[in-house]
Regions:
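Generic protein-terminus/edge-of-domain signal
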Residues: 1-66, 72
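A hydrophobic/aromatic-rich effector-binding and dimerization subdomain
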Residues: 2-17, 73-137
Length: 138
């Protein structure tokens, strides 16, 4: 029997429109279970290697990972004692975190398209992974 993903409630701190969390060996990510939530999630794994399971797709990453996970797309956490990752940074935001109409303006069409593609998950590679990852890791 295939387990159903658990629903995760994401609650940004008061006065914030998104959440930011960073995990490492001293502060491990406790959400290693198969789960989903309505928020879009951007995950940067600094270093290490491991398995990523997003939706029905299972694959492996090396030398870190940068993933954009769409709304309600089931996935597992990426850092545990076996991966050797230095850290994992997670940004979670609702699709309308910048307002209901922000992504409808012409200048945001490509970002809106990226969010739609992310409904199946997007893994970034090469210099994009490194450049964006460094900016996420505060």
């Amino acid at each position: 029997m295939i387990p159903k993903p658990a629903f995760e409630v994401i609650e940004p701190d008061f006065g914030h429109s998104y959440t930011y969390q960073q995990f490492d060996e001293h502060n491990p990510n406790k959400v290693g279970v198969w789960h989903y939530h309505p928020e879009i999630e951007l995950v940067y794994v600094n270093g290490g290697s491991g398995k990523r399971q997003i939706g029905s797709h299972v694959s492996y990453y090396t030398d870190g990972d940068l993933i954009l996970i769409g709304s309600n797309l089931p996935h597992c956490g990426f850092t545990d004692v076996l991966t050797g990752n230095k850290s994992e940074s997670v940004v979670q935001m609702k699709q309308d975190f910048l307002g209901n109409d922000f992504f409808n303006i012409p200048e945001m069409r490509k970002i809106q398209s990226l969010f739609q593609i992310a409904s199946g998950g997007v893994a970034f590679t090469g210099s994009t992974k490194k450049k964006i990852g460094e900016k996420i890791e505060i």
